[in-house]
């Protein structure tokens, strides 16, 4: 399945919440009505079935992290094989994707932009170029911007935007050096309360 290239705000309206697909320079609610689904008949309220609610939650999380359906299924299988809570394991796996860590550190304004930085070989992991967005980052790994990429205006702009929002506690970033450390795996309490991972587990375990 191809990656979605259409309007980002349309996806946020579809899920009824900010999926953080835009840079955050301007509040998303000033751009569109999140409570109204996209389309000609978006204002019509439809009651979702139990399956529909579960599916929407899965789609929401998949779109937040920018992964394709097959990738998401593989992440779920890995999460189910691990000890502990499957839903929390799933979120942890998604959070350790390199493109997501680059975003969390503020080097990219969005996860999509962060994925592009990785793909274009602008990112180093422990001093070596890694151009695989799904690369799994481990605790204590050091993520940095490649020297020849440090002059990119979009990276400086992203760091400026990131400085205005609350920094994740599981990463530590030196904006001057354009370098950050992935200190630890995030705990469930660190992540968005708007995600109900149990709905995803109920859907995928059927």
UniProtKB/Swiss-Prot annotation:
Residues 96-159 form the S4 RNA-binding domain. PROSITE patterns: RIBOSOMAL_S4 (PS00632), S4 (PS50889). The lineage of its organism: Bacteria, Pseudomonadati, Pseudomonadota, Gammaproteobacteria, Alteromonadales. Transmembrane segments: none annotated. Belongs to the universal ribosomal protein uS4 family. It comes from the Bacteria. Pfam families: Ribosomal_S4, S4. This is Small ribosomal subunit protein uS4. One of its GO terms (molecular function) is structural constituent of ribosome. One of the primary rRNA binding proteins, it binds directly to 16S rRNA where it nucleates assembly of the body of the 30S subunit. With S5 and S12 plays an important role in translational accuracy. InterPro entries: Ribosomal_uS4 (IPR022801), Ribosomal_uS4_bac-type (IPR005709), Ribosomal_uS4_CS (IPR018079), Ribosomal_uS4_N (IPR001912), S4_RNA-bd (IPR002942), S4_RNA-bd_sf (IPR036986). GO terms for cellular component: small ribosomal subunit. Keywords: Ribonucleoprotein, Ribosomal protein, RNA-binding, rRNA-binding. One of its GO terms (biological process) is translation. Part of the 30S ribosomal subunit. Contacts protein S5. The interaction surface between S4 and S5 is involved in control of translational fidelity. The gene is rpsD. PANTHER family: 30S 40S RIBOSOMAL PROTEIN, SMALL RIBOSOMAL SUBUNIT PROTEIN US4M. NCBIfam families: PRK05327.1, rpsD_bact.
